[in-house]
Amino acid sequence: MISSFGIRAAIALPLGAAVLAVAIACQPLASSNSSASDKIAFDLSSLDENGLYGPPDGKRSLDYEFCIPVGDAYAQAVGAIDPSVQLYPQSRGRIGCGEGEVLAIGNTNQADHDTVLIELANLDYIERIQPVDWE
């Protein structure tokens, strides 16, 4: 014969484990934006609502570069996120795109520039987005 303690223990242990599992599963995950913003090698807060930076009488947009894998699917995906992007398959850029990669250059002077940059940085195949160093 099973005691009432045995029955309660038999029910409580699995129930407790289930409650613990649900509690852990409901914890917020680290924001994907935090890892995405780590890929962006400049301070987004330095840009105004129009994607410009600098003194009031000398505002300018910021050009940025990153590498994407060769292929139409990658180019189309990036272009759908950032219409300012131009691809330069013959250049490595300062960022140093490797074999099998294409240099992409975009510009912050566009609507929702910060959202665009975060969405680009959220793509697994984009490792870094940095300012273009025009000489």
Task: Describe the role of every protein-language-model region.
Residues 2-15:
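Bacterial N-terminal signal peptides that target proteins for export
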Residues 29-73, 131-135:
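Autoinhibitory N-terminal propeptides
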Residues 51-112:
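Mature extracytoplasmic domains of secretory-pathway proteins
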Residues 111-119:
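Low-complexity, intrinsically disordered Gly/Pro/Thr-rich segments
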Residues 119-130:
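Short acidic amphipathic segments
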